[in-house]
Design a protein with these regions (language model features):
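Alpha-helical recognition segments enriched in aromatics with Gly/Pro capping
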Residues: 1, 97-100, 104-259
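Structured, non-catalytic alpha/beta "coupling" segments that mediate domain-domain communication
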Residues: 20-54, 268-294, 384-396, 460-498
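Glycine- and acidic
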Residues: 66-79, 164-179, 231-236, 256-268, ...
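Acidic, turn-prone loop/beta-hairpin segments
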Residues: 107, 114-117, 136, 219, ...
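C-terminal low-complexity, glycine/proline- and small-hydrophobic-enriched intrinsically disordered tails
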Residues: 269, 395-560
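Core structural elements
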Residues: 273-286, 304-316, 334-354, 398, ...
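Short, charged, amphipathic alpha-helical segments
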Residues: 334-336, 365, 369, 545-553
Length: 560
């Protein structure tokens, strides 16, 4: 070839040092592909292949999503679906592999192709074509794996026969999948389902009405897991170390729609502790005579603390139910975490202790029945997220027929706004006092008087009713009201009033003042640094979106 090019004067030449024409050589890097397994050069070669008219198949599948018969959750993935489907090319469905569904095509002596559902049908068609029996050779290729997978929603149910299973389970409700196979699998199932499956009137039937696109699980640094990076986490190893419930709850609470999961084993350990908290709350109940009372009616509860927790339980039932129905599983898990850990374990249990140790048997009996009811409802709400532990606790805490998995889902409806306001006020007050003591480095054993400034009649009556609880939980020695805040007192705003803790005799005010001033300066410096960082367009464009969001949140917090 080179000699021919030179002979015809087509070669590009340059002069050498002696003035002779020599070929011009330009050094260029080329992208040479190599096979992953063989390591040899991949050379292009034209071959005969089977293709499907994907554009025709895609049209009804596009219409199904556009018209709302099939919905994506989160909805933004519809754009990815449409981008693929509206720009689709003919689909090469043949593969040169040893495994798979063999292509149903047979060739005659002159290479005429006969496509049929069986070899007998192909032979009959060939005999009609040639006018005599001939020997046929079947195509050795197999169907693309995704072509076979596209038939899954109905081929697994006995299709093409009209089986009872096909009638019952097609169409299905929800497909759960990852975004990376929306085109390869989801779109192909839509195309095949609409092409082959029809209702009694002959109308196409979609294989599912909802496509839930779950998050991609990455490592704790946000990197995609791969063997080459050495960052693959085996779920079975995590289950062995932390338990299946802890892993399941972690994945649920971190699976915000549209965001990937950065899986850190430390987070799983934290949610294992949550499971331990639920177990310990049950154990506390058993130690204090808590047991299921089939006749317990929330509406008949008299104690404010019980009516408060029943109100919070009802809110949680509503929130969790709505979140699950809208596939916001992270919000459902977060609502349960807040209710069970913060309200039941941290506060309800603490507020029940004096009742369990008291002499009022009627109050004790109500508290025991109410706590049993709250725990039972909590097990049911937690069951989709922590099935093993909740099933065990459900069976252990009462004699029951059947499994929790087969039980009724909790129903909301109870509400006592006054009780909720009162106990939530108590929680806010004690939390504020504890926080102030911690920030001021007050010794845990030290007590201080509480002076409420600007308290109205409602607050004053609440102080009187809950004086014992406030003194016990916030390490307060006495409670009084005043018109002005005393000097040297830590101040916490609670509703319309200001809670004051005179700490002059318990801490070094000069040291605390210096510490606070130093913290203010540090916060100002951090705010300025973040402000400059966030005003840098290159940082905004190139940084991890999660990092940018965290910096913005922190900057707003410092400005507030």
């Amino acid at each position: 070839i080179i000699e021919t090019i030179n002979a015809e004067g087509l070669a590009v030449t340059v002069k050498d040092a002696e003035g002779n024409a020599i070929p011009y050589v330009e050094k260029k890097k080329i992208m040479q592909p190599f096979g992953d397994r063989s390591g040899v050069v991949i050379e292009p070669m034209l071959t005969d292949q089977w293709f499907a008219d994907a554009k025709t198949l895609a049209e009804p599948a596009i219409a199904s999503v556009r018209e709302g018969r099939t919905n994506f959750v989160p909805k933004n993935w519809e754009k990815t679906y449409f981008d693929w489907m509206e720009n689709i090319e003919p689909w090469c469905i043949s593969r040169q592999l040893w495994w798979g569904h063999q292509i149903p095509a047979w060739y005659g002596p002159d290479n005429e192709a006969f496509v049929a559902s069986s070899e007998e049908e192909a032979q009959a068609a060939a005999e009609t074509h040639y006018g005599k029996p001939v020997e046929l050779t079947r195509d050795p290729d197999v169907l693309d794996t995704w072509f076979s997978s596209a038939l899954w929603p109905f081929s697994t149910l006995g299709w093409p026969d009209n089986t009872p299973e096909l009638a019952k389970y097609y169409q299905t409700d929800v497909l759960v999948t990852g975004f990376d196979i929306i085109f390869f699998w989801v779109a192909r199932m839509m195309m095949m389902g609409l092409h082959f499956m029809k209702d009694e009137d002959g109308n196409p039937v979609e294989p599912f009405h909802t496509v839930y696109v779950h998050a991609l699980v990455r490592d704790k640094n946000g990197q995609k897991m791969s063997k080459s990076k050495g960052n693959v986490i085996d779920p079975l190893d995590l289950i062995d170390e932390y338990g299946a419930d802890a892993l399941r709850f972690t994945l649920a609470i971190m699976a915000a729609q549209g965001r990937d999961v950065k899986l850190d084993p430390a987070r799983i350990a934290g949610y294992r502790n949550f499971g331990t908290k639920v177990w310990n709350a049950t154990r506390f109940g058993e130690m204090n005579g808590v047991k299921r009372d089939a006749g317990f009616d929330p509406e008949n509860a008299k104690l404010t603390v019980n009516r408060w927790i029943l109100t919070e339980l009802s809110k949680t039932v509503s929130d969790v139910t709505t979140a699950i129905e809208t596939q916001r599983f992270n919000e459902a898990a977060a609502s349960l975490y807040r209710f069970v850990w913060n309200q039941v374990c941290d506060w309800y249990v603490e507020l029940l202790k004096p009742i369990f140790m008291g002499e009022d048997e009627a109050a004790k009996a109500e508290a025991q029945a109410c706590m049993a009811y709250v725990l039972e409802q909590s097990y049911a709400l937690l069951h989709p997220f922590m099935p093993f532990m909740t099933e065990e606790l459900w069976a252990h805490t009462a004699a029951r027929d059947g499994l929790l998995a087969h039980g009724e889902w909790p129903v909301s409806g109870f509400a006592d706004a006054d009780a909720a306001d009162e106990i939530n006020w108590l929680v806010d007050l004690v939390s504020g006092l504890r926080s102030a003591r911690s920030e001021m480095n007050v010794p845990p054993s030290a007590t201080a008087p509480l002076i409420m400034v600007g308290a109205n009649a409602v607050t004053s009556s609440r102080l009187a009713r809950h004086e014992a609880a406030i003194c016990r939980l916030a390490r307060v020695e006495s409670i009084s009201t005043a018109d002005l805040a005393p000097k040297g007192a830590a101040q916490i705003i609670v509703g319309e009033a200001t809670a004051c803790l005179p700490l002059g005799n318990l801490i070094d005010l000069g040291t605390e003042k210096a510490r606070i001033e130093k913290a203010i300066v540090k916060n100002e410096q951090e705010k300025d640094r973040l402000g400059k960082k966030l005003s840098n367009e290159k940082f905004i464009a190139n940084a991890d979106p999660d990092v940018v969001a965290a910096d913005r949140e922190r900057h707003a917090e410092l400005e507030g």
